[in-house]
């Protein structure tokens, strides 16, 4: 497996004002593997400890934040002689020990020379429970499922990723017929590392689906294990509703479409806490509308949102989508009103471009832009479609009204730039970060 996130970890490790790192993300996105692999590649040794069901380790942080004393205990627990210069210290499942989270303040203030990297799947939930998180004393990052580019590397197609990232339209278009079926495969396999590994090893979509179903079962058990009892039925109802909501023509989330335990309709205020729980667990993301497409987008956040899942492959599994039935032609890209395509696009925007997408709808609801992201100094509108014959009427209306320097339309047609409109093939989304760094005159995917 190759995760480009390792490059971000390398940047963190070299900072002169480095703070302890807290890496969050949903369960099973590969946080532990990533930190261990980073330690293997960039440090002489790694001291790894896991707080899950480890009472002696938790006791080490009780009652005293004497870092010298804690270091002695960490060496005994990990079996590694820790050196500030060349040892990566990994605290796994740190949300299981609130005192260890609090202690990060003292590592930051008094022992900044040590390289501390923490991983936790439910850190957001731990904070809800009143853990003394050291605000301003850590560096936070979020790990998402493997992107399409990382998937290409995992199945031995790294050369095709180089093509996609070249920015050469003629070169990218020349390999379109090789990239399209691989993108179809990614829609079904997704980016959960275990599912990717299963497919890369067997080339079997069925093997990947078995892994996905196990992951979904694990998440369902997590609801009962970690969520407040009163919220569990509502969390499960939202989770079950997610594929149905995305399969609608209008993908805005409607609370009334989520059934209550008694079979009635849910109310928005009753779902507020369950939504936050799913987001804190990294299992779902709300993409909010904005009342005005201007920077900062979050400053113009409205009250309407679309709810997306963690991973396109998991969404396909939740939807019980038969791989055999949809691999022919381009049906997969448009199935369920393009639900998988929009899931893929927003997922890629987060994972590859580090963007936080929003969307915009005109006051008369006639024009909707699927996604807006912040570029270097402008809001970039994105129309996320899969059809090959696109009119992009909403994008045209948006451009006429707001005159952005450039806009992006995803499609299955070739890569090209025409008067500030970037036609970006869905399989070229791994290069999107380059798009938002440029002006329309020299815009290159």
Regions found by a protein language model. Give the residues of each.
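Conserved catalytic cores of phosphodiester-cleaving nucleases, focusing on short active-site segments
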Residues: 345, 349, 369-388, 407
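Interdomain motor-coupling "hinge/lid" segment immediately C-terminal to the ATP-binding subdomain
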Residues: 128-248
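Conserved lysine of the Walker
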Residues: 31
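Accessory nucleic acid-recognition modules appended to NTPase machines
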Residues: 200-368, 372-373
């Amino acid at each position: 497996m190759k995760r480009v996130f390792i490059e971000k970890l390398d940047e963190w490790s070299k900072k002169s004002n480095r703070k302890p790192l807290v890496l969050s993300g949903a369960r099973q996105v590969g946080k532990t593997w990533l930190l261990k692999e980073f330690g293997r590649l960039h440090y002489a040794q790694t001291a790894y400890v896991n707080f899950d069901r480890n009472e002696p380790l938790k006791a080490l942080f009780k009652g005293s934040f004497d870092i010298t004393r804690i270091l002695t205990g960490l060496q005994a627990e990990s079996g590694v002689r820790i050196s500030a210069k060349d040892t990566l210290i990994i605290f796994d499942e740190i949300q299981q020990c609130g005192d260890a989270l609090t202690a990060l303040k003292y590592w930051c203030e008094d022992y900044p020379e040590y390289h501390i990297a923490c991983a936790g799947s439910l850190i957001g939930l731990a904070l809800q429970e009143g853990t003394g998180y050291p605000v301003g004393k850590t560096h936070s990052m979020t790990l998402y499922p493997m992107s399409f580019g990382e998937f290409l590397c995992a199945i031995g197609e790294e050369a095709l990723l180089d093509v996609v990232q070249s920015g050469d339209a003629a070169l990218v278009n020349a390999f379109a017929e090789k990239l399209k079926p691989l993108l179809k495969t990614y829609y079904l396999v997704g980016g959960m590392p275990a599912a990717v590994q299963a497919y890369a090893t067997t080339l079997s979509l069925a093997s990947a689906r078995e892994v996905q179903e196990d992951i979904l079962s694990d998440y369902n058990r997590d609801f009962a294990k970690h969520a407040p009892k009163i919220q569990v039925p509502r969390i499960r109802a939202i989770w079950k509703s997610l594929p149905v909501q995305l399969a609608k023509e209008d993908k805005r989330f409607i609370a009334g479409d989520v059934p209550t335990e008694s079979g009635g309709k849910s109310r928005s205020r009753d779902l507020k806490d369950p939504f936050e729980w799913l987001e804190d667990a990294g299992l779902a993301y709300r993409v909010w509308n904005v009342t005005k497409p201007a920077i900062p987008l979050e400053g113009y956040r409205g009250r309407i949102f679309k709810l997306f899942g963690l991973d396109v492959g998991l969404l396909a599994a939740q939807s019980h989508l038969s791989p055999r039935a949809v691999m022919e032609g381009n049906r997969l890209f448009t199935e369920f009103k393009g639900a998988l395509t929009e899931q893929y696009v927003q997922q890629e925007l987060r994972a590859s471009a580090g963007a936080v997408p929003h969307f915009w709808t005109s006051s008369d609801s006639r024009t909707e832009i699927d996604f807006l992201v912040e570029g270097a100094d402008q809001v970039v509108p994105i129309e996320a479609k899969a059809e090959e014959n696109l009119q992009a009427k909403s994008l045209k209306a948006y451009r006429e009204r707001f005159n952005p320097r450039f806009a992006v339309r995803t499609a299955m047609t070739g890569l090209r730039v025409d008067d500030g409109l970037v036609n970006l093939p869905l399989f070229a989304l791994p290069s999107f970060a380059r798009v938002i760094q440029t002006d329309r005159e020299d815009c290159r995917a």
